[in-house]
């Protein structure tokens, strides 16, 4: 039911943008972003609390509808390294996005939502022989797909009309996740190329 309401809301925003402007499609933009942040959470079943700063990369592509609305897609991968022994929690996610932006001088603040999905995997190595290609004595591995809602806030800085710097803050929500995935805020920095 929630998915249907979110889809209807996104379609409503798109058509309201179309009704506001005579020239509906005002171009497109896209770019790459690096991110970090702080994630924490307990992984049930193995009793491990994962926390720390993830590192990741991804990108976005959007169509500009009217003066303020943009729709498109984005995708990212994020890795949270643990225990300094090769242990990790990794996320890959993406989806369709809609956002509202408003230019104020050289700044373009924006807010939006991405709806999609992804996959999370984790490898926690509790003990291994210490030798390269050594045998693992005690390790846990898990992998799971998830439905993703990703609300975000950001701001672009217009270097030129074709090149913008962007900074974005989000919190990836995974409703209905079966095992406790670490979550928390992420901050993104990157370039957006406009046409």
Where are these regions (language model features)?
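Outer-membrane beta-barrel "beta-signal"
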Residues: 182-195
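Outer-membrane beta-barrel translocator domains and adjoining extracellular loop/strand segments
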Residues: 40-48, 82-88, 122-130, 177-184
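Extracytoplasmic loops and strand-loop junctions of Gram-negative outer membrane beta-barrel proteins
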Residues: 40-44, 133-139, 171-173
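Short glycine/proline- and aromatic-enriched beta-strand/turn motifs that initiate or cap beta-hairpins
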Residues: 19-65, 71, 194-195
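Short sequence motifs at beta-strands and strand-loop junctions characteristic
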Residues: 49-54, 88-92, 141-148, 181-183
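Gram-negative (and chloroplast) outer-membrane scaffold detector with strong preference
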Residues: 63-135, 147-149, 157-163, 192-195
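Outer-membrane beta-barrel pore domains and translocons
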Residues: 17, 33-39, 76-78, 114-118, ...
